[in-house]
């Protein structure tokens, strides 16, 4: 079996560690794993071929965008940093996943809104992202159509998605030099 996280096992420690107590990593494996590895690996190999650059010399930013989205910086043909984390919830907003948010929002929803851990998890994974912002759909084609018809929330969802992808790509471009 090939695990979808395998490509990202080359990330340096400073890019996969979270700024949490070290024992959460050493004893419990809490770290950035990344996802869509098979896709990013394929893009890396194909870019190497198309650009006629040996894979071990290739520096690119790979974007896997859609209902599930991730961005990966590939340095010398290996995953250097990726936007998804311990779970696929992290990173840029997606169809129904929120992407990166202030972690205290979880506690706020539990203590101030009375949501259980399971309810918060469902909100963040299944009711957020471009679908949650737009109130229309997790399908970007539907959002484009709704935006073209004047739906401001659909346009906002698209604008938010584009902004987070741009800032992630820009940060990764700086990482690659």
Across the structure, where does each feature detected by a protein language model lie?
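Adenine-nucleotide phosphate-binding core of ATP-dependent small-molecule kinases
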Residues: 122, 129-133, 140-175
């Amino acid at each position: 079996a090939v695990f979808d996280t395998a490509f990202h096992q080359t990330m340096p420690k400073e890019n996969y560690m979270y700024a949490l107590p070290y024992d959460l990593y050493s004893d419990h494996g809490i770290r950035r794993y990344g996802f869509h590895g098979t896709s990013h690996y394929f893009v890396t190999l194909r870019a190497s071929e198309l650009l006629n650059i040996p894979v071990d010399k290739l520096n690119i930013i790979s974007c896997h965008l859609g209902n599930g989205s991730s961005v990966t910086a590939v340095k010398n043909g290996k995953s250097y940093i990726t936007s998804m984390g311990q779970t696929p919830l992290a990173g840029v907003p997606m169809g129904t996943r929120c992407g990166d948010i202030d972690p205290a929002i979880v506690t706020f929803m539990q203590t101030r809104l009375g949501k259980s851990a399971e309810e918060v998890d469902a909100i963040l994974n299944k009711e957020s992202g471009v679908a949650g912002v737009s109130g229309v759909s997790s399908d970007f084609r539907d959002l484009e159509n709704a935006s073209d018809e004047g739906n401001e929330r659909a346009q906002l969802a698209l604008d938010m998605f584009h902004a987070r992808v741009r800032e992630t790509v820009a940060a990764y471009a700086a990482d690659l030099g």
